[in-house]
Structures are given as structure tokens and as C-alpha cells.
Amino acid sequence: MFGLGAAMSKFERLLGDETTSWFEYNLDLASESLNGFTSEDWRYLQSKALSFSACVQERCAEAVGDFGSNDGVCVLTALLASSPYLDVAAVAASQLDDMEIELPLALRPRLQHLLDHLTTRHSTRAMDVQRLISHLC
């Protein structure tokens, strides 16, 4: 991939795939690798994240959220708004809630759909989504 930074390549490698283990240690390594990201790397990740498998999208959301930088908000918001996988959207929502991010009102329908889904499943993440809804701007 032309122009892809070393940090981005490392991050993708650390995320692994469905066949690789994912423990707290792996999450920490992936999250720490984001320290080396350039603005180009963040833009690339935002454009690529939705093409990852469900498993890797979820890992990506966890790592970006764990990193806690405003640079990652665009990636988490893209996963929340557009991932076809509701479990991924739920992780992204929880991470955005942890970061105390105010989301645009336009996301209300997606958040409400996600809240209904999580409530039906008795997921503790439903509270995170409820908080996001209450702070829409």
C-alpha cells in the first residue's frame, strides 16, 4: 500500500484476524501503536475500518477507544454510524461514551435502533448508548 505509514501497518498487524488471539495484552499493544499515527494514518484508518471483518472492526473500536485520543473519534463515529455489525456499533458507542463525546443529532435513529437491540439482549452497553442519546447536540 503506497504511502501507508509504518504505524498504520503495525496497527493492522496487531489487530490480527479471526484466527488470532485477542487479550488485554494485545489490546494494549494495538492501542499503544496509535501513538505513532500521523493525520494521514487516521484518515486512512477511517476510510478502511468499515472494510474490516466484524471481528477486526470490534478490535479496532476497542483499541482506538482505549487510546482515548480525539483523533480517533472519527473512526469510532464511522463504526457506530455505518458498521453493519451491531456488536461493533455497540463497542464504538461504549468507547465514545467513555470519552464523553457529544454526537450529532443525526445519529439519533441509529442510536435508538442500537439501544433497542441492546435492551432486548439485556446488554450492559445499553446504558452507554442511553447516555449518548441524552447528550446529542
Locations of regions flagged by a protein language model:
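Structural detector for internal amphipathic alpha-helices that build alpha-solenoid repeat scaffolds
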Residues: M1-F2, G16-G36, S47, C55-S69, ...
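Helix-turn/linker elements and helix-coil junctions of extended alpha-helical scaffolds
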Residues: S53, S83, T119-H122
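Amphipathic alpha-helical scaffolding segments comprising HEAT/armadillo-like alpha-solenoid repeats
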Residues: F2-L14, N35-L50, S69-A81, E102-H117
